[in-house]
């Protein structure tokens, strides 16, 4: 067994993974795991008490994490004319209209988030089979269909993320880097939880935050007590 493997085993033996921990305890466990050669992303996986097959129980939105994600985003903007110039001036990495639509239709996709002005959505909508599975399709709910491209790009750079429940009713999101101070990660996660709670569909009944797991790229998944999160 490698030295790394022995150390992580020793750390994890101290914890009972059949129980749920407080959010701060879960973050502390991840931070005690041996380092790797890159700054790991901290992810959360949240099982929601919804029926995503029902149109009135689908969840999608966006939230600005107070301490950002630690990730440098590649931002693509579908826009023409003055709005295209505005997007370039605001620091978008890729800007175009029909030419960009054709490029993506040809198989090119090299961005982390896509933004579009409303007038472009007729053409962008045709890219559903390419952008949809990658969670890159601009939507009004996520704030990525907008005329204010400058503001949207600035928000994305500062840490605005999209959240969405998948077909199993699970929301997955990156909430920062393991190098972040623990209290910064905690505040980011609490901000996301607050946004999810506010987005709870009226039709959803029973327990809303069913389960909550926090993990790092190379670390274990730690179960977090959802009662604390509902109260935060």
Curated annotation (Swiss-Prot):
Molecular functions per Gene Ontology: rRNA binding; structural constituent of ribosome; tRNA binding
Record's keyword terms, sorted: Repressor, Ribonucleoprotein, Ribosomal protein, RNA-binding, rRNA-binding, Translation regulation, tRNA-binding
GO cellular component: large ribosomal subunit
An individual GO BP term: regulation of translation
Pfam families attached to this UniProt entry: Ribosomal_L1 (PF00687)
PROSITE patterns: RIBOSOMAL_L1 (PS01199)
Assembly mode: Part of the 50S ribosomal subunit.
HAMAP family: Ribosomal_uL1_B
Function: Binds directly to 23S rRNA. The L1 stalk is quite mobile in the ribosome, and is involved in E site tRNA release. Protein L1 is also a translational repressor protein, it controls the translation of the L11 operon by binding to its mRNA.
Family: Belongs to the universal ribosomal protein uL1 family.
Protein name: Large ribosomal subunit protein uL1
Organism of provenance: Chlamydia abortus (strain DSM 27085 / S26/3) (Chlamydophila abortus)
Gene: rplA
């Amino acid at each position: 067994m490698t030295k790394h493997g022995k150390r992580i085993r020793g750390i994890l033996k101290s914890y009972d993974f059949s129980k749920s921990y407080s959010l701060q305890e879960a973050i502390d466990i991840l931070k005690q795991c041996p380092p790797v050669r890159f700054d790991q992303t901290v992810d959360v996986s949240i099982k929601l008490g919804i029926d995503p097959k029902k149109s009135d129980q689908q969840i999608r939105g966006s939230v600005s994490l107070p301490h950002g994600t630690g990730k440098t985003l590649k931002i693509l903007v579908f826009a023409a004319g003055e709005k295209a110039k505005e997007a370039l001036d605001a620091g978008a990495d890729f800007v175009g209209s029909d030419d960009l639509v054709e490029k993506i239709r040809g198989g090119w996709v090299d961005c982390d988030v896509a933004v579009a002005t409303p007038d472009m959505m007729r053409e962008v909508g045709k890219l559903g089979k390419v952008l949809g599975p990658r969670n890159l399709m601009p939507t009004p709910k996520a704030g990525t269909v907008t005329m204010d491209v400058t503001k949207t790009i600035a928000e994305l750079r500062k840490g605005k993320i999209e959240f969405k429940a998948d077909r199993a009713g699970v929301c997955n999101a990156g909430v920062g880097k393991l190098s972040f101070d623990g209290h910064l990660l905690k505040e980011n996660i609490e901000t996301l939880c607050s946004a999810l709670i506010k987005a709870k569909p009226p039709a959803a009944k029973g327990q809303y935050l069913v389960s909550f797991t926090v993990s790092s790229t190379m670390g274990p998944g730690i179960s977090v007590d959802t009662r604390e999160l509902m109260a935060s």
